[in-house]
Amino acid sequence: MEKTKEKAERILLEPYKYLLQLPGKQVRTKLSQAFNHWLKVPEDKLQIIIEVTEMLHNASLLIDDIEDSSKLRRGFPVAHSIYGVPSVINSANYVYFLGLEKVLTLDHPDAVKLFTRQLLELHQGQGLDIYWRDTYTCPTEEEYKAMVLQKTGGLFGLAVGLMQLFSDYKEDLKPLLDTLGLFFQIRDDYANLHSKEYSENKSFCEDLTEGKFSFPTIHAIWSRPESTQVQNILRQRTENIDIKKYCVQYLEDVGSFEYTRYTLRELEAKAYKQIEACGGNPSLVALVKHLSKMFTEENE
C-alpha cells in the first residue's frame, strides 16, 4: 500500500518538481530572511514559513504559465508543454493544499486565516489581470498598481504576516511591503520588454505576445490617447520579432521606459526611507540595491 501511495505522490508532484529544478532567483526566500533581521522568528518556524511561501509561489507559476499561454519559463519549456494542462493544474492545486497542511503545523490560531486571506488576494489580482488582457481593457496606472498589490503583495504579505505571528516586533510593515511589491512587479515589467537578460531567458518580449497590459505599455497607451498602435499590437498576440521590436522602439520614443525607470527610482528611494524608519536593515537594503542594478547600470 505504501509503495502505491508513494508512486501516486511522485506522479502528482512531477510537474511541480520539474519547475523546482529550473534555476530561480529565490527572491522570496531572501526577502523573508532579510525581514527576520527585525522579526527574529525562531528558526524552525521560519523554515516552515519559507517553505510554504516557495510552494505557493511555484504552484502559482505553473498556473500562470497556463493562463498566459507561455512557452518558456526561465529559458526552459513550461511544465504544461511537457506534462499537459490537466496534470499541471492538478499538481499546482495539490501543492496549494500541501501548503495549507504545512501552515497547520505552525499551530497558531491565526495562521490559516492569514493564509486564506492572502490566497484570496492573489486570485483577485490574477483575475483582474486576466480580465483586462482578455477583454482588451487598458487599466489606469492606479488600477494597475492596486492589482499588483493584490497579486505580488499576496505572497509577500503571507510570508511576513505569518512571521509576525511568531514575533514580538509589532511595527506595521504593510507600507514597506506595498512599496516592495510594486517595485518587484514594475521591475519585472521593465525587464520583460527592455533587458538583455530577460530576452535570453524568456522568449523575446513575452508580455507583448501574451497581450498583457504592463507598466510601460499602460503609460504609452494613456500618454498617447490619439494612437492605438500599442493596443493593436497587444491584441494580435504576435510572435513576430519585427513587430515586437517596433513596439519596444515606440515605447522608447514616447518616453515609457524613461517613465518606468523614474517610477522605479522613486520606489527604490521610498523603500530605503521606510526601511530606515523601521530601524534600518542592511540585508534588505542590499537586496533592493542588487535588484536596482538592472535599471540603473544599463543607462549610465
From Swiss-Prot:
First-listed, main subcellular location of the protein, grouped into a coarse class: cytoplasm
Sites bearing N-acetylmethionine, chain numbering: M1
Known catalytic reactions: isopentenyl diphosphate + dimethylallyl diphosphate = (2E)-geranyl diphosphate + diphosphate; isopentenyl diphosphate + (2E)-geranyl diphosphate = (2E,6E)-farnesyl diphosphate + diphosphate; isopentenyl diphosphate + (2E,6E)-farnesyl diphosphate = (2E,6E,10E)-geranylgeranyl diphosphate + diphosphate
Binding site for isopentenyl diphosphate: K25, R28, H57, R74
Sites where the protein binds Mg(2+) 2: D64, D68
Keywords noted in UniProt: Acetylation, Cytoplasm, Isoprene biosynthesis, Lipid metabolism, Magnesium, Metal-binding, Transferase
CDD domains given in the database record: Trans_IPPS_HT
One Gene Ontology biological process: isoprenoid metabolic process
Localization of this protein: Cytoplasm; Cytoplasm, Perinuclear region; Cytoplasm, Myofibril, Sarcomere, Z line
Gene Ontology cellular-component annotations: cytoplasm; perinuclear region of cytoplasm; Z disc
This protein's record includes keyword Metal-binding: yes
Signal sequence, start to end: none
Residues binding Mg(2+) 1: D64, D68
Annotated family: Belongs to the FPP/GGPP synthase family.
Function statement: Catalyzes the trans-addition of the three molecules of IPP onto DMAPP to form geranylgeranyl pyrophosphate, an important precursor of carotenoids and geranylated proteins.
Protein name: Geranylgeranyl pyrophosphate synthase
